[in-house]
Amino acid sequence: MVENQSTSIRKYPKRIPYGMMNFKAVIEDDCYYVDKTPFVEKIERANKFFFYIRPRRFGKSLTLSMLEHYYDINRANIFDKLFGHLYIGQHPTPEHNKYLVIKLNFAIVNAELNDYKKGLDDHCRIAFNFFCDVYAQYLPKGIKEGMNQLDGAVKQLNFLCRECEKTNAKVFLFIDEYDHFTNKILAEPNCLDKYRKETHGEGYLRTFFDTIKAGTDSTIARVFVTGVSPVTLDDLTSGFNIGTNYTLSAQFNELTGFTEKEVRDMLEYYSTQYEFNHTIDELITIMKPWYDNYCFALKKYGKVTMYNSNMVLYFIDNYVNNDCEVPDHMIDENIRTDYNKLRMLIRRDKEFAHDASIIQQLVQQDYITGELKSGFPAELIGNPDNFVSLLFYFGMVTIDGTLEGKTKFIIPNEVVREQLFTYLLDTYKENDLSFDSYEKNELASHLAYRGEWKAYFQYIADSLHKYASQRDHQKGEYFVHGFTLAMTCQNQYYRPISEKDTQEGYADIFLCPLLDIYSDMTHSYIVELKYAKSKDTDAHIQQLFKEAEVQVNRYAQSEVVTSAVKTTQLHKIVVIYKGTEMVVCEEVNNQ
């Protein structure tokens, strides 16, 4: 007889839920879940028709999925399994598992204006049929057959609401990425008139939302809607006066994304599962400039900042699966893909060529001001305040307090900074200015490893002059600084720190070496950029050089610089432009 021998089952570290949007899968697959369930209490006490806008890849879909599982009457039997170890499982609210759930995900709806009605109808038909199947015991008999005799999402939703009322069934309606296809429509030129027809008056999309509103009088008890921008929300819900937009509410500032404490807790856990090569503080120091610094409520400014949750998970996943080494690339390629989707919409800042261009102004002075709008119609998207707000909702800028009675916005982190500078360079390319990628990359490598700086800055100067010669209005110090900064931001070996980031002075650009990624690079740089008008004398150029020489030596002693250069050789470079011609590019010695 063979005796059973007890064996211990190996316990693996919790999975990292990078890219996962299904709450049930996250829990059942033993993933690390940052507990956002305390917000359920606040959501339940809030208006029953809840609108919430956040940038892409900020955890909206997973949060929506968590709420879906929490309120679904069919999942009452697994409530303890899913939520027992979380805050809300130990402090359940009265409404948990009390609703029939309809979930719509507009991200998979065909985004073409001419076909979107069919796409919406097809998506809703599938969702409504699923609803009828899984909740059959709570619904009148024959509801599915009756619904399928009707054409279109509007008629079918209206029918479902009437039928559900007969059995007193209460529905929680979730709509994820409600604005997915309308954002794409708006990005297309000459589509604004067609878009307006669909979102106003008797337009189909407007009628669909009106049907939801009508359903709230009978069977739709709660609605939770997520999206990326408030544009469509404003167009669709004027008159939908039962809903509340909680996007800018301080109490929901931390609903999605991660606080620094949440990031630290996650790192602490994985440090017990893997042999980290860095301390927690060191990893936070590496991650913070790239992923942190979002603020979505003015009252939260100075109190808490939010990390992009997707990027944090990307970093930790790559770190623990790469022998606990910092990833070679700090930016997830999926983020770049999402940026490209937004790019056409951002191009509504069509006055780029003008010095007052909002994005160019943001790059040049490192901030912009404006009034943060909770919503605005698409036809007013070109209004400066509305465009600034659009950049905020897309995550391209974030709240940095107030300035002269207006909200002050800054670029939140290096991930976004690179995206914005990529946008600028792409715009230059569209204006017949091409950049040889191989040549640029070779120059960047030689800058970092060989200390060959002159050719690198000459390449930037040649590119700048070529573009400016085609655009007479592109003149002035702001343009020169913005162009140079955009070019240096494309250098993979450095994180450019510009202007106000150095507290002891205003070094135009400190090329901070990314030694955590490229540990063998040997050179770092401070670039003091000066500008003279075309008519200025040589004596004035000499005076600018003397000023720059003093300044760059002083800046080299700042804590930001001394703590970052480490083993690299620090070069102090003075670059002076006279108009759009670089007339000085010299290294200065210590004084």
How would you name each of these model-derived features?
Residues 2-75, 80-88:
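Walker A/P-loop-proximal flanking segment of P-loop NTPase domains
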Residues 560-591:
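Domain-level recognition of nuclease-like catalytic cores that cleave nucleotide substrates
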Residues 232-239, 246-317, 362:
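Amphipathic alpha-helical segments of the small helical/lid subdomains adjacent to P-loop NTPase cores
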Residues 167-198:
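Conserved P-loop NTPase "ATPase switch" module shared by AAA+ and STAND
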Residues 159-166, 194-221:
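Substrate-engagement module of ASCE P-loop NTPases
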Residues 19, 35, 69-133:
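P-loop NTPase motor core
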Residues 174-176, 206-207, 221-228:
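Structural recognition of the conserved hydrophobic beta-strand(s) that form the central parallel beta-sheet
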Residues 243-244, 306-548, 554-556, 585-591:
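Extended alpha-helical interface modules used as scaffolds for assembling large macromolecular complexes
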